[in-house]
Amino acid sequence: MAIGPKPESIIGSYDHPPQAEAQTEVKSAAINGDTSPVSRLKDFATDPWLTSTDQPQPDSTTNVPYSLPDSTQDARILIVGAGYGGLLFAVRLLQSGFTLEDILLVDSAGGFGGTWYWNRYPGLMCDIESYIYMPLLEETKNIPSQKYVSGEELRTHAERIAEKWKLGARTLFRTTVSDLTWDDNKMQWIATASFSSNEKKQGSCTYTINADFAILANGTLSKPKVPDLPGIDDYTGRIFHTARWDYDYTGGSPAIPAMDRLRTKKVGVIGTGSTAVQVIPQLARWAGELTVFQRTPGAVGLQENRETDHAWWRDNVQLAGPEWQRKRCENFNAFITNPYRASLEEEDLVKDGWTKHPSFSVALGGARNLQADFLDLAKKIDKERREIGQQHINSTVRNPATAEALFNPTYGWCKRPCFHQGYFETYNRENVRLVSTPGQGITKFTINGIMWGDKEFELDLIVLATGYDLGSLCPANRARLSIHGRGGLSMSQKWASGPATLHGVMTRGFPNLFFPGTSQAGVTANQSYMFDRAAEHIAYIIQNARPRTAASAVNLKVLVEPSLEAEELWAMETVSRARAFAATKTCSAGSYTISARLGESVDESQMARHMPWGEGMASYVKILEEWRKKGDMDGLEVVYD
């Protein structure tokens, strides 16, 4: 049983959001191949972007394999995931002194990019400024074409990183790790992996990977989630998820999404979150009729995109000097987590909807979140945000009833905000209609389309913009694999009473395993920055755990894990700051927050252990930097064999 402050003192309680609507909990199904409970969704688990067969491609950064894996693979460091996170871990390890041969990346996709590999729907773009989101811009000398670039450019950048550091030769694509088990005798992680040479042909093999260290760099936006509602198997039209877009049906391509085959089609979209906000305007341009089914309106702010001016880039970005990207990231973090904007002496470099939305620090944590007047100020700023948003909708959308339905009156920290240039204008088109189902969602699928209440909507195509299966907050469940540490203890068992970690990246009983996430760690809206700081920290730990004595000791096995005292102390430091997120308790079940994801079944003391670092990302990063500067690996036990 976890030890901590009395429950009522941990997180606290606040009033409910303005005009908050009760949401009906809609069961959902993760798309996971043959395990999907919905039979017609099983083909959603296949990779629609595979363009090659089984021919070796030794020089390619996508659609590898260069060869079928042997029955056993050996690696010093196994990285699960080859998106931006996995790439950052690989690069920071190389920069810390490891060799390419020390590293092995695996990913279920057929190429680099993670979420940017799987998602190629029309309208896909970054909603965080490209100059801070696209990692390693300094090292690759890449200049993004726009302030917010397309998904195609984001995926190409992942391939650029892989090519620069020659990571293609040390990556196994189409490879899914299902189990990680610690072998105390070998002092290694034994990974069970399955390799699908061509999912469309169902060619596959199973093998093991023996690794001294393992890093879970799986992203959260790659496993599609769909509503598990009656009738979905009865529907006779075409249906797919935005993360598995079918251009053969719609026409067009990821590069040129001219969906001319939809000219005469009746199209329905379920969802109005971040993905839907991007795809709906594109579908409206091409579909004969477009019906949008909305359960809860998104909080959509204006995104002012523009081409990158190279003279501006030279004068305002490059002249900022070494580490300009990190400085810009941290400037962004400062403005989105501090509603006391007058206290910030520096200039807002990013100047977008995010930095004008500092009340989101209620969900992220921040230096001022524990101050007595913080919540009152956050509410005041958020009220101004809602009023500006409502004015924009009312002045843009011509139909008053539609405008009212599109307005989200709840606090801006309950859901991740959306940003777009032209979303609300879409609802002025004659071929677009909004079906608002306040807090309920659709009733069921039918043979011909969708039923809401007693009205049926006939549709040729249903697009599921229903988000992604985030998994639970347990690292094993989040990575969708089974993890057993010392003595056969499962990660899920250890997490059941609330996590205990050192710095949010390691836990005792699971040596040499690293799992960057949100619990007991700093968070920000820019996930690339979070991965980069975790990669920097973990590379330091692994490098400094290696023996530095005689050359004969180089091949010694190393075991590194937190002490029981150190991880409990870090957990209590997190708990003591958990009330920074008190206002998130008022958010509904379908919200973005950790409180909503954990649900009412988790008591306050456990919930507090799951929270991020309450003082915000800057405080968290400073603590890690000071810990590394000391150089004594405080709180870690290191054993050689």
UniProtKB/Swiss-Prot annotation:
Which keywords annotate this record? FAD, Flavoprotein, Monooxygenase, NADP, Oxidoreductase
Annotated positions binding FAD: T115, W116, Y117, W118, D127, I128, Y133
Q: Which EC number(s) does UniProt give?
A: 1.14.13.-
- Which SUPFAM superfamilies does the protein's record reference? FAD/NAD(P)-binding domain
Query: In its keyword annotation, does this UniProt entry include DNA-binding?
Result: no
Tell me the segments the record calls region Disordered.
1-68
Reactions performed catalytically: protoaustinoid A + AH2 + O2 = berkeleyone A + A + H2O
**Annotated InterPro entries:** FAD-binding_Monooxygenases, FAD/NAD-bd_sf, FAD/NAD-binding_dom
Q: Where is this site: Transition state stabilizer?
A: R416
List all Polar residues biased stretches: 49-68
What function does the entry list?
Answer: FAD-binding monooxygenase; part of the gene cluster A that mediates the biosynthesis of the fungal meroterpenoid acetoxydehydroaustin. The first step of the pathway is the synthesis of 3,5-dimethylorsellinic acid by the polyketide synthase ausA. 3,5-dimethylorsellinic acid is then prenylated by the polyprenyl transferase ausN. Further epoxidation by the FAD-dependent monooxygenase ausM and cyclization by the probable terpene cyclase ausL lead to the formation of protoaustinoid A.
Full protein name: FAD-binding monooxygenase ausB
Q: Which organism is it from?
A: Penicillium brasilianum
Q: Taxonomically, what lineage is the organism? A: Eukaryota, Fungi, Dikarya, Ascomycota, Pezizomycotina
Q: Which gene encodes it?
A: ausB
